[in-house]
């Protein structure tokens, strides 16, 4: 299992996002809640079959979930999106 960080939503977001969607390896995009004092906690998991369309859709769902949590959470937590592959 490999986790790749694609986007980290911090209190001050860095501009820009870019990664390659042309792969055929199935996996999942995972939203993790992270803080400096606790272990990362999995909030959501969006699986994909590896096709560009399915992967793009799963990533979009994960980003929307992370952004909504970051916007409405009163705590100083980070919600980060990772891709898990075999």
How would you name each of these model-derived features?
Residues 1-38:
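Short N-terminal "domain-start" leader segments
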Residues 1-4, 80-86:
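Short intrinsically disordered terminal tails
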Residues 10, 49-76:
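A short, charged, amphipathic alpha-helix used as a generic interaction element across diverse proteins
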Residues 16, 59, 83-85:
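N-terminal compositionally biased or targeting/leader segments
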Residues 19, 29, 67, 72-82:
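Short glycine-aromatic motifs
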Residues 26-27, 39, 59, 77:
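Generic short amphipathic/hydrophobic targeting helices enriched at N-termini
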Residues 32-33, 45, 83:
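Intrinsic disorder/low-complexity segments, especially N-terminal tails and targeting/processing regions
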Residues 38-45:
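Surface-exposed loop/edge segments in extracytoplasmic proteins
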């Amino acid at each position: 299992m490999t986790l790749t960080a694609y986007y980290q939503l911090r209190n001050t977001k860095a501009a820009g996002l870019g990664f390659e969607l042309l792969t055929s390896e199935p996996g999942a995009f995972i939203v993790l809640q992270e803080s400096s004092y606790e272990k990362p906690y999995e909030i959501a998991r969006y699986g994909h079959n590896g096709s560009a369309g399915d992967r793009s859709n799963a990533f979009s769902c994960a980003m929307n979930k992370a952004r909504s949590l970051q916007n409405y959470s009163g705590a100083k937590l980070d919600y980060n999106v990772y891709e898990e592959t075999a």
